[in-house]
Amino acid sequence: RVDNGTMRWYDVDLPAAMELRRSYYEDTERFHSIARSVLEFDWMNQLPDDPGERFLFVAEGLFPYLPEDGPRDLVIGLLRRFPGAELVAEFASQDVVRLMSGRFGRGKLRRRFGLSDDVWFRSGLSDPREPEEWAEGIMLLDEWCYFDESDPRIDWMRPFTRLESIGRPLFVARFRLG
């Protein structure tokens, strides 16, 4: 995270994850940690309620783990509470969600990252424009996939992305909310 010397950063995560983070860094005047589920919208009350305030929300490694309707509910909640904000979020395709929510995917998450059996991919998108259908005022501004540019570490996988069933497995999308 890059600090420009003026911005305020609010980090929202589950209490157990926040406790671990606090062992590495503390809150400051401009950095605030909020130990809540993003789906418990009362965390939004801790952010400034100034009509001139501009917000950028970043959801990295979050949406695939939320319940199926979680991303939609959160985006609509942000739209209603912070009109004019932007959201940059990482999404998984429906095919990746099916793969990672099965026995193989759960086992991989458990072995590789030490996650418990109740943590797995639960939600994905078929198309980056899908959130525009959730509510009026959600507008896709940009989207990109990890495979859009050449990188020697993952180039061997690029031919597979031409298969319709794989396509864009993980992608990032930027939206204007309202």
Give short role names for the model-derived ranges:
Residues R1-G178:
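Alpha-helical subdomain
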